[in-house]
Every structure is written in structure tokens, then in C-alpha cells.
């Protein structure tokens, strides 16, 4: 319990230290272009980190979406955050999957929706912090047909990096890119939060390049 208190305190401190979102950024904290929009050539499904607002968060989800749209065309990419039962609460980080079953199911629902609503779309995905565990656990359990539609994944501050050896189990390793910032202890099988854990936005363009390269 003492460790949990330290984690909550660290997250609160870092959240206060993080730069305030601009108006444009605040407006992009959520994206539901798969659920509410037309089918597009590419669908990007993203799970935010613990305590982040909206369904895309602020740190790295929206900038990766923006980078994809700049590279492929805004009318070619649908960005969809994982919301619903995934509330990005802190405590599920301490479970064996580093998240909880309902959060994993919420991501799986989005992958299934992409297949049923937009059977011709190419799916790419990503997750940050707890969201990386959500995507990891969801993708590895997808049926073979749906998994084959997921062309690439980017994982930032991957909480299961050590446990899953820098990859998503039962998914092609060359279709996954893991980003672990120098000094981010989350990537090394701890839940110790440092300032490095807030830096992943700088990798958004590189992540988009990787996702595009796998289409």
C-alpha cells in the first residue's frame, strides 16, 4: 500500500509539472472516427495512459494520430481511442496483466468494430503506459483473421516490456516497435514513475513512420 501511495503521489506531481494542453490539443483528447465516421483506408486504434483524459490522452496519442494524417492524408486515416470500460484508473496497473479484463475487452471491441464495419481498412495500433498493456493483452488474444488485419503496433512506456520481452506475444515481432525513454523505469518491470515517462510525444513522428512502413 505504501508503494501504491508513492506511485499515486508521483503521478500527481508529474501531472502538475506537465505543460498545459493548448486549446487545439484539448479538443483532440478524444477521437471516435471509427465509431462515428466513414470507413477510411487506415484505422489507428490507441489506448491512453493512466489518468489521461479523453480516450486518446494528451502525451502521445493525438500527436501520433496527427503525424499519420499528415503522412497519409487526413481523409485516409481514422483515429479511434479506446474508451468505454477502459477508464485509465491507476489500480489496474498492479494486476498480473498490468491492466484489467474489462479494459482489454474495450480495446478488443474496437478491433472487432474495425473488422465488421470497415472490412477493407488496414488497422494499426498503439498504447502508452497502462494503454500499452491494454493493447498488448488485446492483440495477443485476437483470432488469427483479426490479428492479421493489425499491420503494426507502437508501444510507449511499455509496462510489460520485460515480461513480454519487448514484443507482443503471438504477434510478429517485426510489426512491433517499443519506445522506452532513457530513465523511464516503467519499461524495466517497475511502476516507478519518473519525468522521463512524460516525454513520449517526441517519438510521435517516428512512430507514425514505422506504422506507415508496415502498411
UniProtKB/Swiss-Prot annotation:
Catalyzed reaction equations: cutin + H2O = cutin monomers
Keyword Disulfide bond: yes
GO cellular component: extracellular region
Gene3D superfamilies in the cross-refs: alpha/beta hydrolase
Signal peptide: 1-17
Pfam family, one: Cutinase
Subcellular location: Secreted
Site annotation Transition state stabilizer: residues: 50, 130
InterPro entries: AB_hydrolase_fold (IPR029058), Cutinase/axe (IPR000675), CUTINASE_1 (IPR043580), Cutinase_monf (IPR011150)
Superkingdom of the organism of origin: Eukaryota
Cysteine disulfide links: 39-118, 65-79, 180-187
Keywords, comma-separated and alphabetical: Disulfide bond, Hydrolase, Secreted, Serine esterase, Signal
UniProt EC number: 3.1.1.74
Active site per UniProt: 129 (nucleophile), 184, 197 (proton donor/acceptor)
Function description: Catalyzes the hydrolysis of complex carboxylic polyesters found in the cell wall of plants. Degrades cutin, a macromolecule that forms the structure of the plant cuticle.
Sequence similarity: Belongs to the cutinase family.
Name assigned to this protein: Probable cutinase 3
Species classification: Eukaryota, Fungi, Dikarya, Ascomycota, Pezizomycotina
Amino acid at each position: 500500500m505504501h508503494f501504491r501511495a508513492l506511485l499515486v503521489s508521483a503521478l500527481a506531481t508529474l501531472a502538475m509539472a506537465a505543460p498545459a494542453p493548448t486549446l487545439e490539443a484539448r479538443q483532440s483528447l478524444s477521437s471516435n472516427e471509427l465509431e462515428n465516421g466513414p470507413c477510411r483506408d487506415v484505422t489507428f486504434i490507441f489506448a491512453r495512459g493512466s489518468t489521461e483524459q479523453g480516450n486518446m490522452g494528451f502525451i502521445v496519442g493525438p500527436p501520433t494520430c496527427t503525424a499519420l494524417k499528415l503522412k497519409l492524408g487526413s481523409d485516409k486515416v481514422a483515429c479511434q481511442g479506446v474508451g468505454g470500460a477502459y477508464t485509465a484508473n491507476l489500480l489496474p496497473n498492479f494486476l498480473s496483466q498490468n491492466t484489467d479484463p474489462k479494459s482489454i475487452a474495450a480495446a478488443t471491441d474496437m478491433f472487432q468494430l474495425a473488422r465488421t464495419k470497415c472490412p477493407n481498412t488496414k488497422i494499426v495500433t498503439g498504447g502508452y503506459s497502462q494503454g500499452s498493456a491494454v493493447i498488448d493483452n488485446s492483440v495477443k488474444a485476437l483470432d488469427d483473421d483479426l490479428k492479421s488485419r493489425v499491420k503494426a503496433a507502437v508501444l510507449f512506456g511499455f509496462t510489460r516490456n520485460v515480461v513480454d520481452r519487448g514484443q507482443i506475444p503471438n504477434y510478429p515481432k517485426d510489426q512491433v516497435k517499443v519506445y522506452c525513454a532513457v530513465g523511464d523505469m516503467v519499461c524495466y518491470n517497475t511502476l516507478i514513475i519518473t519525468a522521463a515517462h512524460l516525454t513520449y510525444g517526441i517519438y510521435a513522428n517516428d512512430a507514425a513512420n514505422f506504422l506507415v512502413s508496415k502498411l
